[in-house]
Amino acid sequence: MSFSPPNKSADATIQITEMTRQGTPSSGEAAASTPSTSSTESGDKALEALGYTPVFKREFSRWSSFSFAMSISGVYGTLMSTWIYGLQAGGAAAIMWSWIIGGAGGWALAYSIAEIASAYPSSGAMYFTLKFLAPEEQVPFLCWIAGYLNLVGTVAGGASTEYAASQMLLAAVSITSNFSYVPTPTHVVGVMIGLTTIHAMINTLPTAWLNRLTSGYVVFHISVLLGACVTLLVQKRHDMHDLKYAFTNFQPSSGWSPPGFAFLFGCLTPAWIMTGCDGTARIAEEAKNPQMVVPRAIANATTFTYVIGFFFNLVLVVCMGDPKDLINSPSGQPVAQLFFNGMGRAPAIFFTLCGFGVMNLVAIPGIQAGSRTIFALSRDNLLPFSHIWVRISKRSQTPLIAVWTYAVLEIIINLLGLASSTAIGAVFNVCTVALNVSYVIPIICKMVYGRMQKGPWHMGKYSVWVNAFAVAWNTFMAVIFFFPTRLPVTPENMNYAIVVFFFVLIFALVFWYTHGRHYYTGPLTHSPRATDMSVRTPVGV
């Protein structure tokens, strides 16, 4: 396999004088002043204005970018994987209200990310934007911390997706055996290793193949979700619940006081599902007209996920019967058990396998987005041995070494599953906390320093309110997700997310003070600040 060497031209950035910022023209002015160019040229010009030389082929269109964003959330499969958290937090009412409130926080965060991604379309995503949003003297340190948190959150997110997909496949096997087979942690980890390897192999294909793979995802996803809901509702079981039960029946069992506090733990479900919304921003260098296509994909996919997730939750709650039967399911998958109770064996196997299929289609673009994170951080010399991870394959024009590195990291972190279900639960929590903190840092900088130049997609006068809610809610939830979900605390139910998170944070700080501050100056672009912003308004979108 032959590789092209990393771009070394960025090494001279420190010697280049900062260029004068120019005001951002309105969309109409920019459209009038910008010559008619292809969507690829528009994206490349935007990237060059940010200081990077394009190295990826732009294969992702408006539709495939939206489909990619939908696949990152994968609400059918991801909700099946995390529904247990709301169920244990308080049953029906906890599930519904945690989705409504927690989902609103995720929606605000996604829109805040979309707005910033429109202004700075780069594979570095939110980490990279700090170069433009923070004061110059603070950029190196803030980028360093945000970059490492984003990386560990991304790896934890990919790892938890692979683990959840493995659980779902084995749940289908358990149902097939009439529950005589009970999945063990060893079995789940073994399947996870196989799935991760397959998904990494798929990511060695050229971007055009990945574009085709994700393009049909939305149709499949919606069809499966609607099919499952209709099949459940037409059964007319005697133990179906009404809407009052769905929104008012609260069964606390966590030991927390007041009991209503426990419902916050159910917010992990919408947080985990929506928290990877910047994954689409990481393919900005592979998308056509990324200044509009990427933020639209993020915003539309998140809104769709929020709305359709509400109705899917409602159907599951109405049809769930006795919650204790689901929590104690031998398959280890409450929603799979719900399907079995409500539909029968054959349909339950089918829809559980569909969930497994959806999770595969979440994991594949997850590796793509994660490998681009490693590439972007390495391009800026943030990671050890960056010159290795940044290499691009001449055959596929993708960062193959970064792909396999990311896959290996997923496997390593999932080995925690061999310890206990509590330990693997920490992976889900770390994903949400680390990613959300890495997102909140640039949003706070945007609000405090007022340096952001608007891209063509923005929220106008509502921006500050949406940003403020996103920061407040997700900062609050980052603290909540460190709490143990049950009292009294024992070694078995301890939430080890706080241990993992602060281990990474302390490592990043120590590495910064011993090494990073001596050479890392922030994203290595051709110029310290953006130059001609007029290229940000795309043509033909």
Swiss-Prot record:
Residue numbers spanned by region Disordered: 1-43
Principal place of residence: membrane
Biological process according to GO: gamma-aminobutyric acid transport
Bilayer topology annotation: Multi-pass membrane protein
Low complexity bias locations: 23-41
Assigned keywords, A-Z: Amino-acid transport, Membrane, Transmembrane, Transmembrane helix, Transport
Compartments it resides in: Membrane
Keyword check for Membrane: yes
Keyword Flavoprotein: no
GO cellular component: membrane
Listed Polar residues bias regions: 1-22
Entry-linked InterPro entries: AA/rel_permease1, AA_permease, Amino_acid_permease_CS
Entry GO MF terms: gamma-aminobutyric acid transmembrane transporter activity
Ranges annotated as spanning the membrane: 66-86, 90-110, 139-159, 188-208, 214-234, 255-275, 301-321, 347-367, 399-419, 424-444, 464-484, 496-516
Family according to the record: Belongs to the amino acid-polyamine-organocation (APC) superfamily.
UniProt protein name: Amino-acid permease 2
